[in-house]
């Protein structure tokens, strides 16, 4: 089921209801209606507050670049955290059940892959914070992707043996001063990538903390703050990565 929301300046957007198991999810699709033919698709995964206007705006930015962008909904249509306690409970539910997390994000990927405008041989996934963790799990699930980009996502490695399932290139964009990024997690992540012979990169932005791409991270904490320079640089890094993987 789709509901048309807007079609301004050739950017078409709509909400898309879909399911994973018995759970109804509500995603968001954006593409440039003035472009004909198939084009690369990009899955966008939300931060811990769930699918918000922030991710929808990123999807529209991707559509302006010529991609079909689909924002996945991990939590469910009726699950929209209103505060940090609810956000923590929702994100924690999926971080503690990686198989469920993988099932939810793969359901969103399936919607994107089935879109008639998408070139299924050219698909990537990006995610922010919780979503950054999620796209790494998507890669670990063995999903058929060209690449994933994690923006200030947690880089823990709970199942390092699953690194061997990764078929795509991996780009992690992180704040060098992010207090939520555990150094031991980084070490484990790097070992997993090396041992699994993944084509991977990590870029650190000096002076940037957690949530550096989000003007309003949704909670007051000096360890989570917008950094305009890191935001712009990381977006450009993503664009360069896409130019490489979508050749």
Report residues per predicted region.
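Boundary at the C-terminal end of the N-terminal hydrophobic targeting segment
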Residues: 6-11
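Acidic catalytic loop of the alpha/beta-hydrolase fold
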Residues: 177-181, 210
């Amino acid at each position: 089921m789709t509901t048309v929301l807007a079609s301004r300046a050739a950017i078409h957007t709509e909400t898309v209801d879909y399911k994973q198991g018995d759970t109804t999810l509500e995603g968001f699709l954006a593409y440039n209606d003035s472009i004909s033919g198939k084009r690369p698709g990009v899955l966008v995964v939300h931060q811990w507050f769930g699918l918000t206007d922030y991710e929808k705006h990123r999807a529209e930015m991707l559509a302006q670049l010529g991609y079909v962008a689909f924002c996945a909904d991990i939590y469910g249509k009726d699950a929209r955290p209103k505060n940090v306690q609810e956000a923590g409970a929702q994100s924690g539910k999926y971080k503690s059940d990686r198989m469920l997390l993988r099932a939810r994000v793969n359901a969103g990927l399936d919607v994107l892959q089935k879109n008639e405008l998408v070139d299924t041989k050219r698909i990537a996934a990006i995610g922010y914070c919780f979503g950054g963790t999620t796209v790494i799990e998507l890669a670990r699930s063995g999903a058929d992707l060209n690449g994933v980009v994690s923006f200030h996502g947690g880089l823990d490695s709970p199942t390092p043996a699953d690194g061997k399932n990764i078929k795509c290139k991996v780009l992690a964009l992180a704040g060098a001063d992010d207090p939520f990024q555990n150094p031991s997690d980084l070490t484990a992540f790097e070992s997993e990538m090396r041992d699994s012979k993944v084509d991977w990169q990590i870029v650190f932005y000096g002076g940037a903390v957690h949530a550096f791409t989000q003007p309003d991270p949704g909670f007051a904490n000096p360890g989570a703050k917008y950094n305009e320079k890191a935001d712009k640089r990381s977006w450009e890094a993503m664009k360069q990565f896409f130019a490489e993987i979508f050749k």
